[in-house]
Design a protein with these regions (language model features):
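Extended amphipathic ligand-handling, pore-lining, and cofactor/metal-binding catalytic surfaces
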Residues: 1-293
Length: 293
């Protein structure tokens, strides 16, 4: 069996070319940092994008990609997730697909690095500092005096992911001056119906326009890359535009997205190294040692 390791950075995937191009940029920048070739591979969806919109190179998704690599004699894969928190996509879907492949591919070895944010490590404020940098840049660009901050994520079916959002909001609140930013609130873009998913509340549409969030508002985007939800014309922007129609005094601005900040590479590079020393998914018996690059 080949000892070669294929390194991937993975997101959930999107039908929008901007998301794949952003993931490719992250892969290149992370590869430069760690001295390895990093492949940009989404979990799902992205192969629906026309290659013409991706510089002629088709997008890759996880299962077909690793099967293709098998034909090249590659059986070892190391995944760095571009997920802020412990999403089911990484903790459940990907391991399930690996286990489903293993009966006919016993050599398959997949190690998954930790997600971007460890909510149990209160001393690590790097992700919060990225958000703060982008909030300050937005405040200065718009010449806001004392804006409120709505820190918004997509919304998730797993409470552990929402706890990451809330953890970051607490850190951002501590890092910002209260006199300059009187309100910092965590919210979600959307949620599933039912009481089981009420932990996603409040929704952005219920925050923007209420007292304290009806004048100057910065929408801090806990999104990695542009797509259907984030970026110009996305769902978050539409929610804000609709709120502005009902509240003429509302001045709002979204921050830039996380993937564009150099600080995310510092975090991903650390997670990359941690992933090299993680246990392979579903591995039984003696765990093979990988050499760090």
């Amino acid at each position: 069996m080949s000892d070669a390791i294929c390194h991937l950075i993975t997101d959930n995937g999107s039908y929008r070319p901007e998301a794949t191009l952003s993931l490719r940029s992250l892969a290149e920048r992370l590869g430069d940092r760690v001295g390895q070739k990093i492949e940009a591979v989404s979990l799902l969806h992205s192969t629906k994008i026309s290659p013409d919109k991706l510089g002629g190179t088709p997008a890759e998704i996880f299962e077909p990609f690793i099967k293709k690599k098998r034909e090249e004699g590659i059986h070892r894969f190391h995944v760095t997730p571009m997920f802020f928190g412990p999403s089911a996509a990484i903790l459940e879907y990907m391991p399930q697909r690996v286990e489903a492949l293993r009966p006919k591919w016993p050599e398959l070895e997949v190690r998954i690095a930790p997600c971007v944010v460890d909510a149990d490590d209160s001393d690590d404020t790097r992700m919060a500092q990225i958000l703060v940098d982008q909030i300050l840049e937005t405040r200065n660009a718009r010449s806001f005096k004392s804006p409120a901050v709505a820190l918004v994520d997509h919304g998730a079916p797993r409470i552990k992911v929402t706890e990451v959002r809330n953890h970051l909001a607490r850190q951002v609140r501590q890092l910002l001056s209260e006199s300059e930013f009187p309100q910092v609130t965590a919210c979600s873009m959307e949620r599933r119906d039912g009481d089981d998913y009420a932990f996603n509340e409040p929704l952005l549409e219920k925050v923007i326009g209420i007292e304290g969030f009806c004048n100057e508002v910065i929408v801090s985007m806990l999104f990695a890359s542009p797509g259907r939800h984030a970026g110009p014309g996305g769902d978050v922007a539409k929610i804000c535009e609709e709120a502005a129609e009902d509240h003429p005094q509302l001045q709002w601005q979204m921050t830039e997205l996380v993937a564009g900040h150099d600080g995310i590479i510092d975090i991903l590079a650390e997670r990359f190294q941690q992933g090299l020393h993680s246990d392979p998914v579903g591995w039984t018996g003696e765990i093979p040692e990988w050499q760090a690059p």
